Amino acid sequence: MKHLIIFLLFPFLGAAQPIISCTDVIKPYADFESPLAFEETVVALQKELNSRGITIFATIDHQKAAEAVGESMQPATVLIVGNPKVGTALMQENPRFAIELPLKILIYEEEKTVNIRYEKIAAIA
């Protein structure tokens, strides 16, 4: 009988817990507004990353991919980036880091504003 009461009350106990946004806990991001146009932002960011010795492993143009299947969307590009020397050291210390690397940077346009978003390193450390 005791187990039946606990089982019946369990859904209500969960409702008493504070609501926490998953995005705050799981994926805290840094967001910035770019003063440049979309393409200028992508090029400037690529140049800056290269000047700092950061490898750009891939550039994914989501708008172009959408157009390839007959769809349209706002400009959005993801840069897959990293520094193999730093990444290797992190993965040697903790192999689970491999799921988070390489890092991703999103450049997107929303309501005529160009934004840059990336995951804070502290969130995965």
Model-derived regions, located:
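A broad, low-specificity signal marking well-ordered, structured residues that form hydrophobic/aromatic
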Residues: 14, 30, 77, 105, ...
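Beta-strand/loop substructures that line and gate deep hydrophobic ligand-binding cavities in soluble
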Residues: 104-125
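Hydrophobic alpha-helical segments with strong N-terminal bias
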Residues: 4-5, 30, 86
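Terminal, regulation- and interaction-focused segments at domain boundaries
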Residues: 17-56
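Compact, glycine-rich, soluble single-domain proteins
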Residues: 46, 50-103, 107
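Sec-dependent N-terminal signal peptides
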Residues: 3-13
